[in-house]
Regions:
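Structured C-terminal cap/extension of enzyme domains
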Residues: 8, 77-92, 96-149
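Short, catalytically relevant binding-site loops at active-site mouths
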Residues: 26-31, 48-52, 98
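Catalytic beta/alpha-barrel core
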Residues: 1-2, 19-26, 44-49, 67-73, ...
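Short, glycine/charged-enriched secondary-structure capping and boundary segments
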Residues: 2-3, 35-38, 57-59, 104-107, ...
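Glycine/proline-rich, positively charged
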Residues: 1-41
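Glycine-enriched alpha-helix->loop->beta-strand junction motifs that scaffold or abut catalytic
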Residues: 14-15, 35-44, 86-89, 112-117
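Short, small-residue-enriched loops and turns at beta-alpha junctions
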Residues: 1, 50-51, 72, 97-101, ...
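Histidine/lysine/aspartate-rich catalytic loop segments that bind and position anionic ligands
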Residues: 34-70, 81
């Protein structure tokens, strides 16, 4: 019943000529939408590595309270492997883990691992530098997941 209701809402959104995306912090959101192949146009899902000083420790990633409402990308490898099977565009967010990961590392990791777009928070004075970093990475990027947008 829940997925049928969600499918109806997606159709209503599309009737207005608006794209409809779904996602969140938990990979299960994307997985559950993919099972019945609901007609969303794109996904938005957190992605970042855990190679930073304040990264979650393995024991912090096992309990629901640590991941939900979701402050981390709990299992980046599981996400990357799953998204490799998804044929819709993917916007990765929280790629810099609230500033704990440098833009170059964050953007490289996200794009190399299949994200089609990166939603990155930054201050106005960081835009030019971060855009240059992204352009440099994209000009010399090797990835296995095909670009979806």
């Amino acid at each position: 019943k829940g997925m049928d209701l969600l499918a109806k809402r997606i159709d209503e959104i599309k009737l207005h000529g608006v794209q409809c995306g779904m996602g969140g912090h938990d990979l299960r959101v994307v997985q559950e939408i993919e099972k019945p192949k609901l007609p969303v146009d794109f996904y938005i899902k957190t992605l970042h590595h855990h190679k930073y000083p304040t990264a979650p420790k393995p024991h912090e990633l096992t309990a629901a309270y640590a991941e939900i409402p979701g402050y981390w990308c709990r299992d980046p490898q599981e996400l990357v492997e799953f998204m490799a099977t998804v044929e819709k565009p993917w916007i990765a967010f929280k790629v810099m883990a609230a500033g704990a990961i440098e833009p170059a590392s964050a953007f490289q990791y996200a794009f190399k691992n299949g994200a089609d777009h990166v939603l990155a928070g930054m201050f106005d004075y960081e835009i030019a530098e971060d855009a240059k970093i992204a352009c440099d990475i994209l000009s010399n990027l090797e990835r296995t997941r095909p670009w979806r947008s």
